[in-house]
Design a protein with these regions (language model features):
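Short connector loops at helix/strand junctions that flank enzyme active sites
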Residues: 5-7, 19-21, 45-48, 72-74, ...
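Catalytic phosphate/metal-binding cores of nucleic-acid and nucleotide-processing enzymes, i.e., regions
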Residues: 6, 22, 34-39, 44, ...
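Mg2+/Mn2+-dependent nuclease catalytic core
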Residues: 29-56
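Nucleic-acid nuclease catalytic cores
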Residues: 54-112
Length: 131
């Protein structure tokens, strides 16, 4: 029996001739007994889910030297995360990995305000005030 495939939480389509796609997996704030741990590590689950949905070739290879020559930017992926989880993810995911995967983060704070982080902003430590 095949496993049932679920879609992403948010799918956006746009760009020229609707040729750009943005897939976003979301993990909200937890209120469970172990909420502190869940809120800080929730990004791992979201990242795993989004990676399993990446069925598109992420890069092209040069015919002359076999090196990676370009990244497919038509498909972008995002993590919608509670700010504590986003803070950890931004520090732990290397910028180079985020760039190849076209991975973005949408961080939501307790007031419901959203901050957007592009792949070039990954691999850095951000203090609470940035969120």
């Amino acid at each position: 029996k095949l496993a049932k495939k679920h879609g992403v939480d948010i799918k956006l389509v746009g760009g020229k001739r609707n040729s750009e796609y943005f897939y976003i997996e979301c993990k909200g704030k937890s209120y469970a007994k172990s909420a502190k741990s869940i809120n800080r590590e929730g990004w791992l689950y979201a990242l795993g889910q989004i990676i399993t949905r990446m069925d598109v070739k992420r890069y092209s290879v040069s015919k002359t030297d076999g090196r990676i020559s370009g990244i497919n930017h038509a498909y972008k992926y995002g993590l919608g995360l509670y700010w504590e989880s986003a803070q950890v993810a931004l520090r732990r995911i290397p910028k180079e990995v985020a760039e190849v995967l076209c991975l973005h983060i949408f961080s939501v704070n307790d007031d419901g305000k959203v901050k957007y982080f592009t792949p070039s902003m990954f691999g850095k430590e951000y203090n609470k005030e940035k969120f």
